[in-house]
Amino acid sequence: STCESMNLLGNKVQARNLAMKIGVPVVPGSDGAVDIEGARKVIRKIGLPVMLKAEGGGGGRGIFVIRTMQELEDAFVKASTMAEASFGNPRLFVERYLEHVRHIEIQVIADQYGNVFAFDERDCTVQRNHQKLVEITPSPWPGMTQKLRDQLKEYARALVKAVNYYSLATVEFLVTQDGTPYMIEVNTRLQVEHGITESRYGI
């Protein structure tokens, strides 16, 4: 059902695991929620800097950037406490912190018959404190080729199809300067950024 699909896609760790299962690239990181020792192991494997992210987080909250091993313990306790207070879920996972990336999202609309339509991207790279300030469609970035656009749309469609989700959703990606995309989360709701898609497409 869409209720179950929403719960799965709305949990960052489960959405990440689903993406890996169906071949959608994700940012290197932990396989699931970790404790401090688990976080240390992941960092030793993938290197610094990393982000501690709340499993149930959203809206740019619950993200802590770690640049040295010394910061980890203090940040882990803070992040976990904040995640519990904000989202009712203290669990954290680790992802590599990618710098100088574009934040690109693809909105899709799906019906109960398996049809999934993907709109052109929204570029939400202009941010402050991991929160979006300016959204642009189509992306003004010269690296946004038609090939990359089609690839992102295909990934977005594949994710919602994999769980038989029907309704609106937005799949968010980080894209490196060389055009390598990584899925970071799925929002199963009408986002505030929808306005620019509505202006462009009239939906």
Where are each of the predicted segments found?
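Catalytic cores of secreted or luminal carbohydrate-active enzymes
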Residues: 203
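N-terminal beta-alpha lobe that positions the nucleotide/phosphoryl donor
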Residues: 1-171, 175-200
